[in-house]
Amino acid sequence: MPVIRWWLSLEAAAFGGAALVHAGVLVHGYEHAKAATAESVIGLVLLFALFASVVAPRSSRAMALASLSLALLGTLVGIFTIVIGIGPRSAFDIALHVGFVASLLAGLGLVARGRVWEQRQRA
């Protein structure tokens, strides 16, 4: 359970930071309102899953899988917008999306194998 919460916290912080960059709060030069909105929504979904894992611990795994999957889908939509030319196309944005995909896939793998991993830790 703590691993799931830790991972959701990490992902929510990453999307929140990206939203702040795209809003021009942390760094100037990468402003993009639609990207900031999308990253904010994804970050809030991840925070909701984190909150749900505290309130209803038995649903942690399901909430994490659902929220990480939604975040991955949103990130893939972001990559699609970059490819077709309507999303931000800086090197920062490309690296950001590649990093998001890698971390989300790692998180999904970690959560999906969570019970096996937890059983090995207890043995």
Please describe what each predicted stretch is.
Residues 1-123:
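Topology signature of small-to-medium multi-pass alpha-helical membrane proteins
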